[in-house]
């Protein structure tokens, strides 16, 4: 079977960049990923996958990748006539792009495919566009369906569904799930805050993170309430950024210099699942995605050295640690409280700072997770390095279908 490798990865810094365009960010990560792969040019690239969610709010509803890459083509930096496939899947967008590049290589379509994710969610001149971007992640054709669904679920969670101004529907749905988890399993606000504080502490060592200051659990709990039990520090911020990865075949890699081959990381598995309107006591779609990924890679959860997961809120990290098999159902809070998910623990999670602290430019997030894991597996993560890391997992979800994400990706990387 053909093997696929990530030969280069790169992420921009995440933050609020009112003076930078989508084209600016695309240029940075494209040139950055070439440099990381040790390539003088992109002439071998045979396919491109471009992920973005929000350019439609600026009027760019289609051909987004072509628009952002054309200046590079004109300058001779990006090869001509390369197919550019535009993808969107909410917060899972960049993971979908990587999945496409991976399939390109496995199918023999090309020996080198690029995945790029770019997003700008900070729009001080028209903040309503940011809310429109997020609203697009939930069914806009049948609002009554999910309004009644959440109203009924809120009763079961002990937290009435009462969306309010100044926040997205996502925060309310995560808060309801957290409230139900607390009522059912005894999870505490402090356990959620411990996971959050861990990530803020980690991001202080990540030069590309949006927030680079440590917080204690007490700081997190004292922050402004968003939707109980969530405080502002527990919720991913608004911001901009981009990330990219180059996926190659084993045959192409074998032709590269030894220094390039030495830094390549194999994609052991890449799985996707779609969400549904589930009950609160049903497992989420990431559990199935993880089970499929472990089977494809011939691994179990015990083989994972570290993970990056989609913590749009800090409760999500506790929940995903359960769905991914790092602990039993209902035990995510206790796992975080034990220190197991911190640097030096048995299963470090979100050492990049996670979405809540590294940042969450929607269409770039999945590839930024991959960039963090590449740094870790190459031994290049500095103060947040996991000693001896060989196998890593990225879980990313996007959009909402009830209490499921609409799309979920689980990717396993291995250093051979």
Predicted stretch roles:
Residues 1-23, 148-164, 194, 225-292, ...:
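Condensing-enzyme catalytic core mediating Claisen C-C bond formation in acyl metabolism
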Residues 26, 64, 93-97, 170, ...:
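Catalytic-loop motifs flanking and including active-site residues across diverse enzymes
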Residues 1-89, 100, 173, 177-191, ...:
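Conserved active-site "lid/cap" helical segment
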Residues 42-52, 82-87, 113-117, 190-198, ...:
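Beta-strand segments within the central parallel beta-sheet cores of soluble alpha/beta enzyme folds
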Residues 199-200, 204-212, 224:
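ATPase catalytic-site recognition across NTP-hydrolyzing enzymes
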Residues 87-119, 171-205, 245-251, 361-381:
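Active-site-proximal alpha-helical scaffold in enzymes
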Residues 55-64, 278-283, 311-334, 361-363, ...:
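Short glycine/threonine-rich loop-to-helix capping motif typified by GTGT followed
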Residues 2-5, 52-116, 120-126, 132-161, ...:
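Conserved catalytic cysteine-centered active-site region
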């Amino acid at each position: 079977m053909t093997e696929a490798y990530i030969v280069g990865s790169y992420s921009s810094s995440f933050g609020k960049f009112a003076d930078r365009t989508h084209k600016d960010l695309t240029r940075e990560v494209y040139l950055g990923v070439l440099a990381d792969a040790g390539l003088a040019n992109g002439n071998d690239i045979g396919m491109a996958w471009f992920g973005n969610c929000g350019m439609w709010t600026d009027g760019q509803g289609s051909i987004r990748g072509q628009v952002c890459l054309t200046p590079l083509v004109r300058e001779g930096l990006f090869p001509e006539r390369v197919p550019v496939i535009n993808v969107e899947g909410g917060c899972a967008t960049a993971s979908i792009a990587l999945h496409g590049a991976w399939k390109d290589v496995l199918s023999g379509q090309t020996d080198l495919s690029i995945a790029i994710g770019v997003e700008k969610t900070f729009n001080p001149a028209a903040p309503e566009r940011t809310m429109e971007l997020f609203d697009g992640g939930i069914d806009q054709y049948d609002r009554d369906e999910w309004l009644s669904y959440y109203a009924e679920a809120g009763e079961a969670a002990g937290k009435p569904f009462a969306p309010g101004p100044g926040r997205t529907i996502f925060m309310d749905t995560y808060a309801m799930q957290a409230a139900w988890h607390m009522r059912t399993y005894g999870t505490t606000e402090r356990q959620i805050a411990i996971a959050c504080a861990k990530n803020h502490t980690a991001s202080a060592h990540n030069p590309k993170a949006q927030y680079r200051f440590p917080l204690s659990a007490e700081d997190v709990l004292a922050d402004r309430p968003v939707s109980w039990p969530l405080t502002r520090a527990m919720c991913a911020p608004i911001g901009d950024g981009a990330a990219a990865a180059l996926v190659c075949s084993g045959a192409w890699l074998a032709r590269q210099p030894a220094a390039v081959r030495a830094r390549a990381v194999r994609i052991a598995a890449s799985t996707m699942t779609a969400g549904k309107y589930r009950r609160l006591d049903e497992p989420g779609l990431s559990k199935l995605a993880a089970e499929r990924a472990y089977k494809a890679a011939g691994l179990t959860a015990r083989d994972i050295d570290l993970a990056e997961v989609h913590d749009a809120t800090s409760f999500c990290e506790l929940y995903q640690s359960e769905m991914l098999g790092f602990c039993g159902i209902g035990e995510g809070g206790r796992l975080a409280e034990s220190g197991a998910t911190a640097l030096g623990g048995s299963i470090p999670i979100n050492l990049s700072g996670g979405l809540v602290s590294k940042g969450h430019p929607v269409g770039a997030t999945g590839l930024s997770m991959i960039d963090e894991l590449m740094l870790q597996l190459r031994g290049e993560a500095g103060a947040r390095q996991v000693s001896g890391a060989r196998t890593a997992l990225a879980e990313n979800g996007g959009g909402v279908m009830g209490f499921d994400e609409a799309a979920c990706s689980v990717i396993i990387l291995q250093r051979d």
